[in-house]
Structure formats: structure tokens, C-alpha cells
A protein has these predicted regions:
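Short acidic N-proximal helix/loop "leader" segments that mark the beginning
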Residues: 1-9
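Ordered, small/hydrophobic-rich secondary-structure cores
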Residues: 9, 13, 19-118
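Short beta-edge strand/loop motif at the mouth of beta-sheet-based domains
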Residues: 18, 30-63, 68, 72, ...
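Short amphipathic alpha-helical segments
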Residues: 19, 25, 126-133, 137, ...
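A structural signal for alpha-helix termini and helix-coil/disorder junctions
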Residues: 29, 39, 140-147, 151, ...
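Conserved short hydrophobic interaction patches
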Residues: 30, 67, 133, 137-144, ...
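Beta-strand/loop substructures that line and gate deep hydrophobic ligand-binding cavities in soluble
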Residues: 82-129, 200-269
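Surface-exposed beta-loop interaction hotspot
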Residues: 115-173
């Protein structure tokens, strides 16, 4: 590096239900990771390749640097290329997951993410967004281990763009669902009966109860001249793949309508 390295570091520890083996299946296998974080390709071994599919045309590539079943997995990613800064003077993004079994049938999971850079604005923006993004992901993992442990999800992804602030867009989506965002509140998200599990200014999380089960994460974020709204689903139950094939575009249309005439573009994958 041409400048003294600046350390970027994030660490969090949380408890989830399940044995060490069950938690390992959730955080260190492709089917498990894809069921609460994002669609993932993973070769389950040290040196194996890993790819996180983050939406249309967006993927993060890396490789596994440690693989200790039921205890520890570590992988590195090229975060500079991911955000359009190829060749930047930074080290790989290293993420480590550690599992510690507790009495009573639960485990503590410790996540440590780190890298070195130069302190450039784009680095700080990336880390700020990434650390904020862990809270909803960990809620997903907690709920997955509580309600869907051992199952593999079918992914749903829909998006639209609109005018107005991300906070206003999220409020419009909540209004379209008829919810205030109180935990435990029930609603119908199109044809899925759901309960509210988490609500924040730009994000809320629903747990689908019928006719399919699963998780639906609703997001809104600043995309420059517009706001992007998204729903990311992890669906279980009776033939969720058929549901996604038939309903994914309809979810895009719902997002467009929910954000009230402000949509410039809507697309499904």
C-alpha cells in the first residue's frame, strides 16, 4: 500500500437456537446460506470458491480460507471490484464465522469482518452500509433457525425504483400492507398471510405463515437520482419454486404500485 493502512473492522456476537451441527449447516453450506442471507454458490472446503448473488448483475466472488466443520468458516472477497473500484489499494474483505455451543440447545455465533484500506470515502461508505445490513440478516438467521431449521429456501427477488426518500418509500410499502410496523402485527402481503418480525425506517421483515411459509424482507435505499425498493423472499412449503416463477413479476408490479406513481423502472430476475 502506498499509504499507511487504515483498519476496517466489524464484530458482532449473537445467540441462535440449534446445535453446533445445525448452525453449521445454516452458515457454511450453500443451501443453508441461501435460505437466510442470499443465493450462494460454495465449495465446502478450504480453498473452495464462494459466490454471493446479490441481485440482477451483482455478485461477490471469493474463496474459503478456513473450513472447520461445526466450528469455523472464513472466506475472503474482492470488495473493491464489487463496488466498482478494481485495483484499489485495499486488502481482501475477510469474514469469519465462529460457532460456540451453549447448554440448552443453542449456540453463540461470532462474526468478525475486517480489511485494510486507505480511508477513502468509498471505503467508509461501503463499511457503513455493510454494518447496517447485518442487523436484518441476523434476524433472518435467527428466524430461520427458529422456524425453518434444516430446510432449503427458494429465493424471490423483486425491485422497482421511485421518487422520494427511502424512508417515504418504506412508509408507502407499510401503508400498502396496512401495517404500522409493530412486531406481531399481521397482514396479507399480496396472497401471503404474514406477521411483522422487525420494522426500521428503511426496512421491515415479515414472516409468511400461509399458504407458503418463509421470510419477506422489504428494503428501500438511495440510488442517486431515485430510490430503489426491493422485496427479498426466502420461501418454504408446497412448491415455492412454482410460486416464484408465477408471481415474481407481480411482486415487482406491487412494489411499483405501492410507491404510488413514482416508479421509473421495475424488473424481476
Amino acid at each position: 500500500m502506498t499509504k499507511p493502512p487504515i483498519s476496517h473492522h466489524f464484530e458482532i456476537e449473537f445467540e441462535v437456537p440449534g446445535s453446533a451441527d445445525e448452525v453449521w449447516q445454516a452458515i457454511a453450506t450453500p443451501g443453508g446460506i441461501s435460505s437466510w442471507m442470499m443465493p450462494t454458490d460454495l465449495e465446502p472446503r478450504e480453498g473452495g470458491e464462494v459466490t454471493f448473488h446479490m441481485g440482477p448483475g451483482a455478485a461477490s466472488h471469493g474463496h474459503v480460507t478456513a473450513y472447520e466443520p461445526s466450528h469455523r468458516i472464513t472466506y475472503e472477497e474482492d470488495w473493491a471490484t464489487l463496488v466498482g473500484q478494481p485495483g484499489a489499494d485495499v486488502t481482501p474483505l475477510v469474514s469469519e464465522f465462529l460457532i460456540e455451543a451453549r447448554s440448552g440447545g443453542s449456540c453463540v455465533v461470532r462474526i468478525v469482518t475486517s480489511a485494510f484500506g486507505t480511508g477513502a470515502d468509498w471505503e467508509n461508505e461501503f463499511w457503513s452500509e455493510m454494518t447496517l445490513g447485518w442487523a436484518p440478516m441476523l434476524d433472518n438467521l435467527r428466524l430461520y433457525m427458529t422456524h425453518f431449521r434444516g430446510q432449503h429456501a427458494t429465493s424471490l427477488f423483486a425491485s422497482a425504483t421511485c421518487a422520494g426518500s427511502p424512508e417515504a418509500a418504506a412508509a408507502s410499502m407499510r401503508e400498502a400492507l396496512g401495517i404500522e410496523g409493530t412486531t406481531g402485527e399481521t397482514c396479507t402481503a399480496r396472497d401471503l398471510v404474514c406477521a411483522v418480525e422487525r420494522s426500521m425506517d428503511r426496512h421491515f421483515l415479515l414472516r409468511a405463515e400461509r399458504p407458503l411459509t418463509g421470510l419477506l424482507s422489504f428494503f428501500s435505499y438511495d440510488a442517486g437520482e431515485s430510490t430503489t425498493v426491493q422485496v427479498v423472499g426466502y420461501l418454504f412449503g408446497d412448491n415455492p419454486a412454482s410460486y416464484v416463477a408465477e408471481e415474481q413479476q407481480a411482486w415487482c408490479d406491487w412494489l411499483a404500485a405501492a410507491t404510488a406513481g413514482t416508479t421509473a423502472d421495475a424488473a424481476a430476475t
